[in-house]
Amino acid sequence: MSLEDDVKAIIVDQLGVSPEDVKVDSSFIEDLNADSLDLTELIMTLEEKFAFEISEDDAEQLRTVGDVIKYIQEHQN
């Protein structure tokens, strides 16, 4: 499974959305109807899965699925 597929699977599971709705340019708030609690839980799950911490400032900048994928690519060991 690719990084993109892993991230999308986590988003589908955490937000309870359809896999077809999760695209690289999908906005968590506008397209996937996530609220701040959803986003906090999503960040915690991503941190656990990919074994690194996402700072609060960085988390606020992660607005789309693509933002998350790019962030993980840049911060993985």
Swiss-Prot record:
One of its GO terms (cellular component) is cytosol. HAMAP family: Acyl_carrier. The lineage of its organism: Bacteria, Pseudomonadati, Chlamydiota, Chlamydiia, Chlamydiales. Keywords: Cytoplasm, Fatty acid biosynthesis, Fatty acid metabolism, Lipid biosynthesis, Lipid metabolism, Phosphopantetheine, Phosphoprotein. Its main location: cytoplasm. Pathway: Lipid metabolism; fatty acid biosynthesis. NCBIfam families: acyl_carrier, PRK00982.1-2, PRK00982.1-4. Belongs to the acyl carrier protein (ACP) family. The keyword Metal-binding does not apply. It is found in: Cytoplasm. It comes from the Bacteria. 4'-phosphopantetheine is transferred from CoA to a specific serine of apo-ACP by AcpS. This modification is essential for activity because fatty acids are bound in thioester linkage to the sulfhydryl of the prosthetic group. Pfam families: PP-binding. GO terms for biological process: lipid A biosynthetic process. This is Acyl carrier protein.
